[in-house]
Amino acid sequence: MSAKAISEQTGKELLYKYICTTSAIQNRFKYARVTPDTDWARLLQDHPWLLSQSLVVKPDQLIKRRGKLGLIGVNLTLDGVKSWLKPRLGQEATVGKATGFLKNFLIEPFVPHTQEEEFYVCIYATREGDYVLFHHEGGVDVGDVDAKAQKLLVGVDEKLNPEDIKKHLLVHAPEDKKEILASFISGLFNFYEDLYFTYLEINPLVVTKDGVYVLDLAAKVDATADYICKVKWGDIEFPPPFGREAYPEEAYIADLDAKSGASLKLTLLNPKGRIWTMVAGGGASVVYSDTICDLGGVNELANYGEYSGAPSEQQTYDYAKTILSLMTREKHPDGKILIIGGSIANFTNVAATFKGIVRAIRDYQGPLKEHEVTIFVRRGGPNYQEGLRVMGEVGKTTGIPIHVFGTETHMTAIVGMALGHRPIPNQPPTAAHTANFLLNASGSTSTPAPSRTASFSESRTDEVAPAKKAKPAMLQGKSATLFSRHTKAIVWGMQTRAVQGMLDFDYVCSRDEPSVAAMVYPFTGDHKQKFYWGHKEILIPVFKNMADAMKKHPEVDVLINFASLRSAYDSTMETMNYAQIRTIAIIAEGIPEALTRKLIKKADQKGVTIIGPATVGGIKPGCFKIGNTGGMLDNILASKLYRPGSVAYVSRSGGMSNELNNIISRTTDGVYEGVAIGGDRYPGSTFMDHVLRYQDTAGVKMIVVLGEIGGTEEYKICRGVTEGRITKPVVCWCIGTCAAMFSSEVQFGHAGACANQASETAVAKNQALKEAGVFVPRSFDELGEIIQSVYEDLVARGVIVPAQEVPPPTVPMDYSWARELGLIRKPASFMTSICDERGQELIYAGMPITEVFKEEMGIGGVLGLLWFQKRLPKYSCQFIEMCLMVTADHGPAVSGAHNTIICARAGKDLVSSLTSGLLTIGDRFGGALDAAAKMFSKAFDSGIIPMEFVNKMKKEGKLIMGIGHRVKSINNPDMRVQILKDYVRQHFPATPLLDYALEVEKITTSKKPNLILNVDGLIGVAFVDMLRHCGSFTREEADEYIDIGALNGIFVLGRSMGFIGHYLDQKRLKQGLYRHPWDDISYVLPEHMSM
């Protein structure tokens, strides 16, 4: 959502910090917060003025008309404040229909004043600009300010100066206070603009001879402007409306939402309720809540929420487990219902999101059965068949009753089933699988001939425009036709999947050439990107610079902007500098409303139509589609969006626009054009803009509008119909009717879906539309029936002529999508069994990285997982780490370290220097671990005694690997060997090979004291003992790891630490290029050459 209410304390804190005015504002920062946990001694220490001044106390919990409700204590001493708070603090209170606990109060200095010194000031945002209201009689009895106050509209990008304030607002204000008031209101407006407020009311504003006092303040800020205002706002809190508690689960989901590109929302309405929802889509979530309330479930509705924007499997798992946890805390005598609903997704992989929900259901299967939960599922969109399949499977395997439905079932039908208002079908009809649409040959089956318009052309010569004359449909310069079969677009953003979807749509519509001419992506250089046009591969240019793209593609008149919310404004502003662009679609959600209004103003000046922000876009069947609109090809074909029908629609929601595609295709001859204007409070183009376009488009025979709670745009349709400007039949339904039934305000999924006054409620708008002559169903459940009824009447009157269906061309399926659907298989080029990075978290040999840290497995444990696919005993992990420590380095003189140093001093980088050192490891340097392990193992396993082994090796003239040291001896032992030997003997369950090697050492050292078991030999034999006797490996596995060189890996890994150390050491010491001295080189040349 966008506009969010803040507490009075937060509002005043920001005001006192950042307002700039010549008026003397008194009592700055003089307020004290009191809660049930307040330490009064500490409070007095922080606010000593509490003891010396008369005080005012009031709740700060977004409660309106506190004075009228007797919730303000005035002119009290500190003891009086405490007495006043005693029966109220922490107690339950009822305000209107809402009941809640009073637990947050504000104490401020009492300001003695007269009624004549009280004024009313309010600033609030609208599409056209910001209204400033002023009334010279403020206070508790101010009354209907809309009717009484002086009002001034400050247009977008305009400034409010003191002279205008005096002239238009301060007409009835006392002369001696006009200057102070003008300065304060001017500063207040600038403060309101700079900190992205959407509503700011002060009542009363008191002006005395001492200065200005802000007594009571109410405010809302645009929460989407957080990235702009973070420095000034700080960590701002948004309290829930009075009567609704702030639950930790709501905060948890809000935190998930903030960290995700997807949208995740949760509001708890009644935690003891019986009916729970988990709905995909901002618009769909409102429709489901409406239907539940319409069918009498308002008192049992437990939550409102939605997930959308393609959340990952892990995100939907976290969201689902939160809801399942909440609904299984308290039992209900009638059991509970979970509605997992949603419209037809445009781009969300339904199977992926459902797999997250299925995981959560499996985890909570015990509590779900215990609480007698029945689950109803309805969804459509990409890969939805697989999603429904896994959902049905989990019902069978867990024994939880789960009823699963797809696009063949009306979206809200499951609500009626869940509440017992309609029967649950035993075998619901199943929609065709994706492959059936995409892989069948065009002529393989006979094509039915449903009703549709007689011609595929955009307009027919025998069509007659409406007879009634009226003002032009669009603002001057804006075209009634946005898209045609020849429309060309530029896509801003590296959205290859969306572009391929547009090209597939173009191909199935039999367009002559692709609709995407170029892409703009400022983060790479100019290049070309490969796409498919049917079977062929084509290249589409990608430009770093928008100017280059526009210059090289003058035929383009549409820009589809996939820029993020932070850059969408700037990129759209830049786009409007090019006269060739007539339509811009802004996909991003979360653009601050103040910036959107600037976009709208410039678009109106330039004659540009903006669709969005916060939209999936729009579609004109047979001609053009924006980005992901209409979903994947299976939905395009199922909803017959490859050719035009007779019905045009406009909605706010992208998901609901796809649902309308489905409803319209099932009840009429199909869609002529459909636009989702976006869920923000100020969409770039309005319902009326598009309705008037449709009215003036000959091919459109009827219009469908899916309105929404919030705003007043739908009333313009009422006026258009009553004044005769709109003559075509209009079917309209405004979603959000349930809002009137809730005791406290609910902000629905879309930023604009919140009524600020009675006229903005869905109920009021539906009633007005009906009275104006618009076809209005009784509920969304009946929308399809009304559309069908109006359509059939038009067919009966001959307005729409049935025509033969023409099959679309076959489009090849993408390989990656076909593989995901399980339609094809191909041998993988690579196989891996140790690590999987594809999911929400990294997995080492089946163990999530979080578990690795939780179990404190350390480097040895991780090495065990990655090298051996085993979770090794703790002593084995410790032994591996000790091996890495003792092999880490052996000074700069050894060949590997020497090479590393030479390379580093030659100016090479770390990787080159490290590699040069590692390349010296072999039989002569570092390779003795493997050789020692193999040699001792072979001797031990063959059954020969140590003396026989020594004699045999001597006879064959071979060295015993792992025996001998240049410096160390039996009299000067190697401490590395001693440490490891002690550890192994103390912790290993058995050490037969180590014992054998030590017996060999006794024989060799009796001949020469430096023929000791060295560190390579000890690690080699001890490692074999570990593999064979730790219990994690079979004998075959242990032998295989020795054969494939696992032991050399220990030396390579350990010594890499030392080599890197030598590299960093040389760089730190700033050593220059090394040249070996001549006197250390013996030049031995052939005699005849030296002569």
UniProtKB/Swiss-Prot annotation:
Annotated CoA binding sites: L769, K770, E771, A772, G773, V774, F775, V776, P777, R778, S779
EC identifiers of the protein: 2.3.3.8
Post-translational note: Phosphorylated by PKA and GSK3 in a sequential manner; phosphorylation results in activation of its activity. Phosphorylation on Thr-447 and Ser-451 depends on the phosphorylation state of Ser-455. Phosphorylation on Ser-455 is decreased by prior phosphorylation on the other 2 residues. Phosphorylated at Ser-455 by BCKDK and dephosphorylated by protein phosphatase PPM1K. ISGylated.
Domain ATP-grasp: 4-265
Description of activity control: Phosphorylation results in activation of its activity. Glucose 6-phosphate, fructose 6-phosphate, fructose 2,6-bisphosphate, ribulose 5-phosphate, and fructose 1,6-bisphosphate also act as activators.
Catalytically driven reaction(s): oxaloacetate + acetyl-CoA + ADP + phosphate = citrate + ATP + CoA
InterPro entries registered for this protein in UniProt: ATP-citrate_synthase, Cit_synth/succinyl-CoA_lig_AS, Citrate-bd, Citrate_synth-like_lrg_a-sub, Citrate_synth-like_sm_a-sub, Citrate_synth_N, Citrate_synthase, Citrate_synthase_sf
Ligand binding (Mg(2+)): D257, S260, A262
Cofactor(s) annotated in UniProt: Mg(2+)
GO molecular function: ATP binding; ATP citrate synthase activity; metal ion binding
Family note: In the N-terminal section; belongs to the succinate/malate CoA ligase beta subunit family. In the C-terminal section; belongs to the succinate/malate CoA ligase alpha subunit family.
Name of the molecule in the record: ATP-citrate synthase
Source organism of this protein record: Bos taurus (Bovine)
